[in-house]
Amino acid sequence: ERLGLADAPVQLASETSVEDIVSTLSEGAVPRLIVIDSIQTMWTDTVESAPGTVTQVRASAQALIRFAKKTGATIILVGHVTKDGQIAGPRVVEHMVDAVLSFEGEGSQQFRILRSAKNRFGATDEIGVFEMTGLGLREVTNPSELFLSERELGSPGTAVFAGIEGTRPVL
């Protein structure tokens, strides 16, 4: 309700079995966007090892990727990160997917940066800046304006400089 999505065509489910997920998604119209959170907890009964192992993560991701290619659905595989920002658990999925994106920012800050580490279809040196509002995440179309608005005018020892993040100039 807070995000204004009460009537949106969104369905939620809680499941970690890839076979059950694919079976459910195959019933009726296939969703255009599927979010799996998190790939490290998925498991498939085609592999005899514990969830989270390299074998399970790879097999689960492969099954979901096959489903996406067969149906044309877009699947976002969420992977959690460690405290130092590395993808938690096995890193095999990075080599299987079309893009690896990270959402960076401190929990106490209202701004987040979306950064691309891999992108088969475009540049990896681009960023997106977003602001967490009461209505959810909103794109910051002019990050320079945002950064300059927080600047104290007349502060000794400060300067504005033009930098480049990807192809985007940032002040």
What are these regions (language model features)?
Residues 45-46, 86-88, 112-113, 126:
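Short glycine-/acidic-enriched loop or helix-start segments at secondary-structure transitions
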Residues 44-51, 82-83, 156-160, 171:
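Short hinge/gating elements
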Residues 26-34, 40, 105-171:
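Conserved P-loop NTPase
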Residues 55-76, 80, 96-107:
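Substrate-engagement module of ASCE P-loop NTPases
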Residues 2-6, 16-20, 39-42, 54, ...:
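Conserved nucleotide-binding/hydrolysis micro-motifs of P-loop NTPases
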Residues 1-66:
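Conserved inter-motif catalytic segment of the P-loop NTP-binding fold
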Residues 36, 75-77, 91:
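Long C-terminal interaction/binding lobes of large macromolecular proteins
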Residues 86-96:
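Short regulatory helix/loop adjacent to the ATP-binding pocket of P-loop NTPases
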